[in-house]
From Swiss-Prot:
Source organism of the structure: Cucumis sativus (Cucumber)
Keyword Metal-binding in annotation: yes
Record field: compositional bias (Pro residues): 114-137
Protein name: Cucumber peeling cupredoxin
Residues modified to Pyrrolidone carboxylic acid: 1
SUPFAM superfamilies: Cupredoxins (SSF49503)
Domain annotation Phytocyanin: ranges: 3-107
InterPro entries found in the cross-reference section: BlueCu_1_BS (IPR028871), Cupredoxin (IPR008972), Phytocyanin-like (IPR039391), Phytocyanin_dom (IPR003245)
SS bond list: 60-95
Length: 137
């Protein structure tokens, strides 16, 4: 059975007080193929645009994206494809102030999902070396 996820729950789709609000909201949820996201926002205040790439999402780079912007609340986005999906508000500086959501969509019959990666993992950090356990003395 599919689930409708109300983005931001009672907060809705708005410029959050914390830039991590939407990533924290998504962290505790499993998004499956066939589910939907519902974005609720005041008329003319916000919009919803699905970004093509993580790079565009991270940079809030939505040049030439006017064609695909949904402006009438509530916006329902059906999750039909596996993998990462990136949603932003293209109004003013809303995206750069944290009004953006990335989610990982898993198969409808998946039993366990991994949490999505953090929005900006460090690229130059090496994992710590694996040390053998001390030998018993």
């Amino acid at each position: 059975q599919s689930t409708v996820h109300i983005v931001g729950d009672n907060t809705g789709w708005s410029v959050p007080s914390s830039p991590n609000f939407y990533s924290q909201w998504a962290a505790g949820k499993t998004f499956r193929v066939g589910d939907s996201l519902q974005f609720n926002f005041p008329a003319n205040a916000h919009n919803v645009h699905e970004m093509e790439t993580k790079q565009s999402f991270d940079a809030c780079n939505f040049v030439n994206s006017d064609n695909d912007v949904e402006r009438t609340s509530p916006v329902i986005e059906r999750l039909d494809e596996l993998g990462m999906h990136y949603f932003v508000c293209t109004v003013g500086t809303h995206c750069s102030n944290g009004q953006k959501l990335s989610i990982n969509v898993v198969a409808a019959n998946a039993t366990v999902s991994m949490p999505p990666p953090s929005s900006s993992p460090p690229s130059s950090v090496m994992p710590p070396p694996v040390m053998p356990p001390p030998s018993p003395s």
